């Protein structure tokens, strides 16, 4: 099998724990792109916030290179940040998700992602540091009133941050009980976030939509990730790859598990094995 596109999660996959990029990953990505390969960050973040990373990878402003943002809520071409597709939350549903989540604990902070902006309510100290390390632009807000929801740009997702797994599970339960599990896609990420998108919006379906637009079969697509919000794209891809630091559920889903973790060039390992050296999946 000849692979033509690699979709990659960012945090705890492509990026080191401190938010930087291993130079092995940078070199391998640039080498693959130089051969006509497509490297697509597939992230929960906004496409605006990944622009510094795209510059490091040599992808910023490139025609026929893409970013999938908001866990599949938007597909954007790097040239001119041309938005090809958005799949937004209904404003009323977004408001209900927010209200349900913050009721669980007074220490919870909440992120509201619109197509162009990130708003954060009750910003925590740990989240402030996390955002700073990754140069993610955001705007702090007070409690959002009805006008906020009705006048906002299209809302891509609502997420909640808390360091305790038990609290994150409570948030998940509270939101799903309130709005109904059929109304949203609910996932965990980065061992700190609980994320809610519109039903049917996840990284896997977005990968399929992009592949269709590019005339690719999913058998020609590789995907790599570490956490539960990556499961759908690993399942959808022709070759699903887990980094060594991935959670057990991801490792079980993946076709192959890398030797290296995110801090030691797992993405480069995958590219060198399956793209740059022309090794196909028959050797797994």
Question: What annotation goes with each model-predicted range?
Answer:
Residues 4-9, 40-41:
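Short, hydrophobic/glycine-enriched beta-strand segments
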Residues 1-5, 22, 195-284:
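Mg2+-dependent phosphoryl-transfer enzymes with acidic/Ser/Thr/Gly-rich catalytic loops
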Residues 23-128:
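Active-site phosphate-binding/coordination module
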Residues 3, 36, 64, 155-156, ...:
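Short, well-ordered alpha-helix to beta-strand connector turns
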């Amino acid at each position: 099998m000849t692979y033509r596109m690699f979709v990659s999660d960012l945090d705890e996959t492509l990026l080191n724990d401190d938010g930087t990029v291993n130079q092995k990953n940078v070199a391998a990505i640039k080498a693959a792109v130089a051969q006509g390969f497509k490297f697509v960050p597939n992230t929960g973040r906004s496409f605006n916030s990944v622009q510094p990373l795209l510059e490091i990878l040599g992808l910023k402003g490139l025609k026929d290179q893409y970013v999938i943002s908001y866990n599949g809520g938007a597909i954007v071409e790097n040239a001119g940040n041309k938005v090809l597709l958005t799949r937004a939350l209904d404003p009323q549903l977004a408001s209900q998700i927010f209200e349900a989540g913050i009721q669980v604990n007074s220490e919870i902070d909440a992120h509201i992602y619109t197509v162009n902006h990130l708003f954060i309510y009750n910003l925590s100290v740990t989240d402030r540091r996390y955002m700073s390390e990754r140069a993610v632009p955001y705007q702090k807000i007070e409690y959002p009133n009805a006008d906020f929801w009705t006048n906002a740009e299209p809302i891509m997702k609502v997420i909640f941050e808390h360091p305790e797994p038990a609290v994150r599970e409570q948030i998940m339960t509270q939101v799903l009980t309130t709005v109904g599990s059929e109304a949203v896609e609910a996932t965990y990420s980065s061992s700190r976030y609980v994320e809610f998108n519109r039903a049917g919006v996840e990284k896997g379906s977005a990968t399929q939509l992009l592949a269709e637009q590019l005339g690719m079969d999913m058998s020609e697509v590789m995907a790599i990730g570490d956490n539960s919000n990556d499961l759908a794209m690993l399942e959808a891809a022709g070759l699903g790859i887990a980094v060594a630091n991935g959670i057990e559920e991801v490792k079980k889903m993946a076709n192959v598990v890398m030797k290296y973790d995110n801090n030691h060039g797992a993405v480069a390992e995958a590219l060198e094995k399956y793209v740059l050296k022309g090794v196909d999946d028959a050797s797994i």
